[in-house]
Regions:
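N-terminal small-domain helix-loop-helix segment of the aminotransferase-like
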Residues: 2-102, 109, 280-283, 387-389
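PLP-dependent enzyme catalytic core of the Aspartate aminotransferase-like
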Residues: 83, 91, 332, 341-350, ...
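Short acidic capping loops at alpha-helix termini that bridge into adjacent secondary structure
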Residues: 92-97, 117-120, 226-227
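Conserved PLP-anchoring active-site segment centered on the Schiff-base-forming lysine
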Residues: 113-135
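A short helix->loop->beta-strand "cap" motif at the edges of active sites that frequently abuts
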Residues: 119, 140, 198-202, 226
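Active-site phosphate-binding strand-loop segment of PLP-dependent enzymes
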Residues: 148-216
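Conserved core segment of the aminotransferase class I/II
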Residues: 226-294, 304-306, 386-387
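Conserved glycine-rich beta-strand-loop-beta hairpin in the small C-terminal domain of fold type I
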Residues: 278, 294-304, 315-328
Length: 389
């Protein structure tokens, strides 16, 4: 007799598709046929993990460091992160640092600690598409804040005072943000930290791109207050995307709760990755990371004028990360169709902007400057030829 398949949870059906996956699938199919694909769709630079980090991982495995760690993370790694913050003028106790399975693990942990079923999280549109999923996974909902290019696609304290309601218990910021690369302006960040404190709301700030700032040192939100959550990661600045390692700085009031959640949700972050990450804070590795940041800045400065010349509207230079968020309305009415047709005809992979925004018109595109300048130049040449047809 046929068996009846039980229904899956409603949350699965409610998750919107990753539109870029159509581009990724097209790219894979083309590469399988031998086409040279230029990948400007994935948030992962072409840099490899630093050699000192690789050596530390090999040493850890050879020494048998493959078992569980404390759920909070290796004490030495938490101390190293604390010292890294101290080098920025911040006193962050290692007791307030939780090692996580990537920044995603940190965001999920922060959401689980702060959001009750039915409560809302204030979040800017556009946003990284996984962030609302963390909120929904713990039974919350997102209260979207529509932002504009003139506001650096970031919310403001005035917007919060105007839009927040009783159901909004958390504000989540990204500093700088994906897909825009724009940081929260300093005055607005200070005002929003104060607003959360004054109104009794939690604040979660995703700072995984904060070390990758191009216009001087971008200060952490922790300089403005210590009573909120900050997410960090080894993925972007230290080029450890596949190692799945991040951290969460917790306010004192949430340390015990987050540790309890981490014990039950994750057991621990990957042990070998933790031992490897200890090498990230050596002076030579930090110097290498900063040198790579300068390379990314050079790529940004090379790419944006050329994109503008092709007809892409880029309202402002990104402050950090490695993304350009461009309005292609002069070139297309549908960025999804544009990106799919572009990859098929040229082998240049870009990300349609509808993955990031419910409010913006469907003409925006995210372009990652994660390839060499020579490859970026080739991508631009192909796009120019495509537009000329």
């Amino acid at each position: 007799m046929p068996t009846q398949t039980p229904p899956l949870a409603l949350r699965v059906a409610e998750i919107p598709p990753f539109h870029v996956m159509q581009v990724v699938a097209e790219a894979a199919a083309l590469e399988a046929k031998g086409m040279d694909v230029i990948h400007l769709e994935v948030g992962e630079p072409d840099f490899s993990t630093p050699s000192d980090v690789l050596a530390a991982a090999q040493d850890a495995m050879a020494s048998g460091h493959t078992r569980y760690t404390d759920a909070r993370g290796l004490p030495a790694l938490r101390d190293a992160i604390s010292a890294w913050y101290a080098s920025q003028g911040l006193a962050i106790s290692a007791e307030r640092i939780q090692i996580t399975q990537g920044a995603s693990g940190a965001l999920l942990l922060a959401a689980a600690a702060t959001v009750n079923p039915g409560e809302q999280v204030l979040m800017a549109d556009p946003a990284y598409p996984c962030n609302p999923r963390f909120v929904e996974a713990v039974g919350g909902a997102v209260h979207w804040l529509r932002t504009e290019a003139t506001d650096a696609f970031q919310p403001s304290a005035a917007m919060l005072r105007r839009s927040a309601c009783a159901e909004d218990h958390v504000l989540m910021l990204a500093h700088p943000a994906n897909p825009t690369g724009m940081a929260v302006p300093a005055a607005e960040l200070r005002a929003m930290v104060s607003w959360c404190q004054d109104t009794g709301r939690h604040l979660i700030v995703d700072e995984i791109y904060q070390p990758l700032s191009f216009e001087g040192e971008l200060q952490s939100s922790l300089h403005l207050g210590q009573d909120h959550f900050v997410v960090g990661s080894f993925s972007k600045y230290f080029n450890m995307t596949g190692w799945r390692l991040g951290w969460l700085v917790m306010p004192e009031y949430a340390v015990s709760a987050c540790q309890k959640l981490a014990q039950h949700l994750f057991i621990c972050a990957p042990t070998t990755a933790q031992h490897a990450a200890l090498a990230c804070f050596r002076p030579d590795v930090l110097a290498e990371a900063d040198a790579r940041k300068e390379i990314l800045k050079s790529r940004r400065d090379f790419l944006i004028p050329r994109l503008r010349a092709l007809g892409f509207d880029i309202p402002m230079m990104p402050d950090g990360a490695f993304y350009v968020f461009a309005d292609a309305s002069a070139l297309t009415e549908n960025s999804q169709a544009f990106c799919v047709d572009l990859i098929r005809k040229t082998g240049v992979a870009l990300t349609p902007g509808n993955d990031f925004s419910q409010a913006l018109p469907p003409t925006w595109i995210r372009i990652a400057f994660t390839e060499t300048e020579a490859r970026l130049d080739e991508a631009l040449r192909r796009i120019e030829d495509y537009l000329a047809c």
